[in-house]
Curated annotation (Swiss-Prot):
Pathway: Amino-acid biosynthesis; L-methionine biosynthesis via salvage pathway; L-methionine from S-methyl-5-thio-alpha-D-ribose 1-phosphate: step 5/6. This is Acireductone dioxygenase. It comes from Picosynechococcus sp. (strain ATCC 27264 / PCC 7002 / PR-6). One of its GO terms (biological process) is L-methionine salvage from S-adenosylmethionine. Monomer. The record marks R99 as: Important to generate the dianion. The record marks E90 as: May play a role in metal incorporation in vivo. Fe(2+) binds at H91, H93, E97, H136. Belongs to the acireductone dioxygenase (ARD) family. Binds 1 Fe(2+) cation per monomer. Binds 1 nickel ion per monomer.
Length: 176
């Protein structure tokens, strides 16, 4: 179940419409799409993109996105902990970070000006667009299992720009 956790009030939201409204009020786009494809752990990037082409292609065309790829994070990945550490550091991007979760789950953390830090646990079917310049970090968890389609205007825009704030250190105990 998709959840949104507010660290200051310790309130957890579970209603998709309420989560969408909360995120929208902070400039973050959130939708839920169907995920009918039955994907194996070994499904290739081409297989995953083909399985969702009927919704992905029109979405990309309507929003000016040029390319997509698949991130497949699971416990069998070599050096997962080192990879996880890169995602766990607060950063921004020079373009929107758009992810469509097709399997598993992951935790997006947000540190927005004027708002207490909060996180969104995204799962299969969730589409989230983190606006460019938004301070955030991502956690696939200590035992990862997530397949997500990454959607780009320009793949160079995905390069993380680390803030160096280390605010994420305060929240390391909260994970999937």
């Amino acid at each position: 179940m998709t959840t949104l956790y507010q660290t200051e009030s310790k309130q957890t939201l579970t209603d998709p419409a309420t989560i969408k409204d909360f995120l929208k009020s902070h400039g973050i786009w959130f939708e839920q799409w169907e995920t009918p494809a039955q994907l194996t752990q070994e499904a290739s990037q081409a297989d995953i993109l083909a399985a969702y082409a009927d919704v992905l292609d029109p979405f990309m065309a309507a929003n000016g996105y040029q390319s997509a790829d698949v991130v497949n994070i699971h416990s069998g990945i070599e050096n997962y902990q080192a990879i996880r550490e890169k995602f766990l550091a607060e950063h921004t991007h020079s373009e929107d970070e758009v992810r469509f979760f097709v399997a598993g789950q992951g935790l997006f953390w947000f540190n927005l000006d004027g708002t207490a830090v909060f996180n969104v646990c995204c799962e299969a079917g969730d589409l989230i667009s983190v606006p460019q310049g938004t301070k955030h970090w991502f956690d696939a968890g200590p035992v990862p299992n997530v397949k997500a389609i990454r959607i780009f205007s320009d793949t160079a825009g995905w390069t993380p720009h680390y803030t160096g704030s280390q605010v994420e250190q305060q929240y390391r105990a909260i994970t999937l």
